Amino acid sequence: EKFGSPTITGAVDFLSAAQFLRYSSAMFVVRELTSAAKNATSSSTVVTNVNNKDHWDEIKSAFGADSGDTNVGAWIGKWAGALGNSLKAEICTAAGFAAWAYKGEFDAAPGTSAYASARGGSNDECHIVVVDEDGEISGTVGTVLERFAFVSMASDAKAADGTNNYAADVVNSSSEYVWLAHWDGDLSTMSNAGTAASGTAFGNPSAAITKSLTGGVDSAALTTAEVATGFDL
């Protein structure tokens, strides 16, 4: 894991951990939050909380058209706090690749994967970048933090080595910065995304879809009891 610089309110905890790691190679970290903390999302109106992977697995079915809730943005910051407001996610299919600002991050344009082609599907591939739009994470505005190449909009997609290549699953299992919550609202022009590959022509929008994350809020100061709860986990 990577940790930022100590703040006035968190200096004691930060420096205690830093000192411990000078003579130890491993440390358990618990992030205790108050109800004030919110994850940044690509929605301008709805904020939410996703505490960790276990919590995500519990609540992810509540997002998207199938649940009736498309108000939460398609992209959600992986952790609560204002730092997530520095993030931007972009997703691009074949039609928009030539004019995409981030095409140089990838070897070639996305298209139709071998998996989808073998099943009569088309245009399932997309490229995704996660960008430090404001420079608050990396220290440099516009730094590309993560790239996901040739991932598929098909829910059953497999890569050549047999591993899961469904874009949402790839992002949610390996990104350090964002969750991909659903394909509705923000990403609705990527039609049929999230369905099986067989016979499916996936949406191929003419330009990359860019979404900045907002609404992230830091935790309020912890009480002694809340700190103790963290130690009990």
Model segments located where?
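Surface-exposed assembly/interface segments
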Residues: 1-233
